[in-house]
Amino acid sequence: MGKKARFKEARRLQKRNLNNAIGSSSINSQNSLTNDKIGKGKNKGPTERYVLPFEKNNRFLLLGEGNFSFAFSLLLHHVSSEGFVLATSYDSKEDLKQKYPDAAEYISKIEINGGKVMHEIDATKLHLHKKLKTQKFDTIFWNFPHSGKGIKDQDRNILDNQKMLLAFFKASKFLLSEKGVIVITLAETKPYTLWNLKGLAKDAGYTSLMTEKFDSSFYPEYSHRRTIGWIDGISERSPWKGELRDSRHYCFVVNGSNIKPYNQRKEKRKRSELSDDSSDSS
């Protein structure tokens, strides 16, 4: 067995051990996502139809992470040894501890598994960050973006988020590789459907590559967190599960890109291709 093969096997075993360990970790006290899904009609586990909006060997930049559970689940299940994940939060490290008590454990597992984490990353100023502006990424992922300013007036709230997203699109161009794709996930409800996301992308010089209905069951460790953070005594009693909302991935590429939409490629993704073993043995 060559050096590369040994590395892949070691990572496969590490992922399996981490996945087994997660069930008994303190994360489970605040993340009952897997158990909550059992028996619910609209969440019967991964479906054959969901198409991952990325390749497993991509260089990923994740923005606006809350408790970093999505980043961990992505890295654990869908990133090969050739891939790389840089997960970031807008919050400072100290604010993160207060808002998301379970974040520290997810961050630790991300780093153990080969990913990196950064804090205080403003998605609208990526091109100005000294550690990011020289890097290139194949997938820039932002799940459920929101300015988090608590603006009560809906029209002003929509405008504020549109300004944020337009600035993000413009800043991201400097960090995209030649095959780079931006993936934004939004709930399919108001006010998000009023943001005119595709129009904003077009104004910034992007073309819509594809859209794909988000299936959170492919990210079993993922539990969505509100921008305001976790509130003891309230959040754990709330039936609201952000990751279970009807949501959609919107994928964009820079104008002139010849990237083919993932859901139109000849090799259809099957459930077996998404297992831990296959992601590390190819």
From Swiss-Prot:
Enzyme Commission identifier(s): 2.1.1.-
Name of the top EC class for this enzyme: transferase
Main location: nucleus
Keyword Nucleus applies: yes
InterPro entries in the record: BMT5-like
GO BP: any one term: rRNA base methylation
Segments for region (Disordered): 18-46
GO cellular component, one term: cytoplasm
Location within or outside the cell: Nucleus, Nucleolus
DNA-binding is among the record's keywords: no
Catalytic function, reaction form: uridine in 25S rRNA + S-adenosyl-L-methionine = N(3)-methyluridine in 25S rRNA + S-adenosyl-L-homocysteine + H(+)
Superkingdom to which the source organism belongs: Eukaryota
Polar residues bias spans: 18-35
MF term (GO), any: rRNA (uridine-N3-)-methyltransferase activity
Family: Belongs to the class I-like SAM-binding methyltransferase superfamily. BMT5 family.
Biological function: S-adenosyl-L-methionine-dependent methyltransferase that specifically methylates the N(3) position of a uridine in 25S rRNA.
PANTHER family named in the record: FERREDOXIN-FOLD ANTICODON-BINDING DOMAIN-CONTAINING PROTEIN 1, PHENYLALANYL-TRNA SYNTHETASE
Name used for this protein in its record: 25S rRNA (uridine-N(3))-methyltransferase
Species in which this protein is naturally found: Schizosaccharomyces pombe (strain 972 / ATCC 24843) (Fission yeast)
Source lineage: Eukaryota, Fungi, Dikarya, Ascomycota, Taphrinomycotina
Gene encoding the protein: bmt5
